[in-house]
Amino acid sequence: MKLACVVLLTLTFCSSAALGRAPSYKYKRLGSDLDAQTRAEPGIALMGGGSDLDDAFRWLCGKANGGDFLILRAQGKDDYNRYVNKLCQMNSVATLVIPNRKAADEPRVAQIIRQATVIFIAGGDQSRYVDFWKGTPLQEALNAHVTAGKPVGGSSAGLAVLGQFVYGALDNKSNDADLASREVLADPYAKRVTLVRDFLKVPGFDNTVVDSHFAKRDRMGRSLGFLARIVADGWSKAPREIALDEKSALLVEVDGRAKVVGTGMGAYFLQLTDPPEVCKQGQPLTLRNVSAYHAPSGAGFDIRGWNGHGGEAYTISVEAGQIHTSRAENAVY
């Protein structure tokens, strides 16, 4: 007899299992083994990495109305299961690890994703998400999830893949350091500056780059380079970026209104108003009149109207790879 109980279930559903082969993915679930029959509310939680924010996860759980919480990873363990299960009252909390394209092609993987009430894409390495998941039934199931108006969230690498335009980190080696702003400002077409598009179709995040660890890792320069590249490559005339610092999150409602929570530096919103003057291979970037808005914790921003309250608007320019701002003492963040 099937029991619906609060225990750890290690499930090995996989089409290849019937043939005696080990499953190509890992799926571990806490809570009921029966999927909830509940109606979720739309919402998007952008988390900037560092320490997990209880408020952001509680908000995501609230959008799920007690349904089934699914964490997606390309590598790693199921540590989020216990964290979310303790934090929220959910029907179930599960982690699905999809470590290669073979796993992403498994019919059971897409089925698990389609049955989830809320999905959170964990941090890690976004190149794995792009390499392993793009062009697979997993990607289709993820897009079906957001199209259906179900809540979704991501942190760090899992945050990066939520925008239409994505820094893919595709040419990074396992021991490479983080792509630094100085590298991109010196040459926006450097080998490691790999941009991809249309991985997910999250409402309100078209024409947008999303990034994390922003002030903590000094990522303003590389973000400006990404935006300039997007224009120079003909992808968009006026691309935008939403960037979250560590220990910060942006909670976006269905109408585009969002609030910033957390103890970090908050959120940054960038938009190009003029095309770059110099954005060529082997040459430092020159770019002027970038619109910027810094929204600290407690501030709000409307991603549809692209305006905020409780924060500070300023402008940024780049001259031969050097950043200049309209703020006092040329402050970038």
What are these regions (language model features)?
Residues 112-115, 135-149:
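Catalytic-core regions built around general acid/base machinery
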Residues 21-66, 87, 173-333:
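C-terminal and late-domain segments of enzyme folds
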Residues 76-115:
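Portal/gating segments that form or line small-molecule/metal binding sites
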